[in-house]
């Protein structure tokens, strides 16, 4: 591994600048990605082709110069071996098919049907000059897709089901949690240097609901993986960060990836034992270069001095940004943070 600054930051070792990578860095904004994606009618078929998945995973490292590679896959691939049919409709996102018989979902021995994920990680571990990130969805985020059977704007079905069918909801969460522990374990054994858990839909929950219905499952997964792989950093990404941060800090993750609803300066000072990742708005990448640099400078200025940190967005890159802007953003983060923080006032 030629560049391990990302791992060093997660482990709070001395670094000369902040590492930077971006959620959805392998995606439609890259012409090089689109050239490969067009070969496949099915998104899942694309994910299952190890050779092409490896190529698009590594593209951001070669093109943008990011400090980590995240495997190209989808959080929903775990559901197929559990017994839930998943398809991706053109322009409409994922569609799931099942009969709500959650007690019969398979939660153990699911790894054999996910061998393409583990083969991809082995290839990336061999070829990548930077640390490799494996990932999965958090139980509640996956449960939301299962209950809604598709993407949702307000998660009404999920919350009604959670409150009215508590027994079945907890059965589903338990099954997902058990499967996730096995899945993450195999990812690490296959070469993942870091694991990121995506809880994208935690933003739909009140603090009470998060603590009552979700928290224990997240804590169980992180504790289980830490017992098996104590030296592998775990990042927990959660939207609605301002609502749930007081609970998330106790989950046991090494780092929290937060959205733009929190002040980085504030959370870094309040929770100095944790590493934070984030949290710029993705829309910044749509600005002209002068304004991109301005936002990067202001952001770096707000990170407390001598704080371990990973620069990222508060959510994924949108397809409408230009490759040049993303590359410039990465360059700015490196340049501004490299030994130049003394040029800027503290927040």
Swiss-Prot record:
It is found in: Cytoplasm. Its main location: cytoplasm. Substrate binds at residues 24-28, 74, 145, 200, 315. GO terms for molecular function: uroporphyrinogen decarboxylase activity. Pfam families: URO-D (PF01208). The keyword Disulfide bond does not apply. The record marks 74 as: Transition state stabilizer. Homodimer. This is Uroporphyrinogen decarboxylase. The gene is hemE.
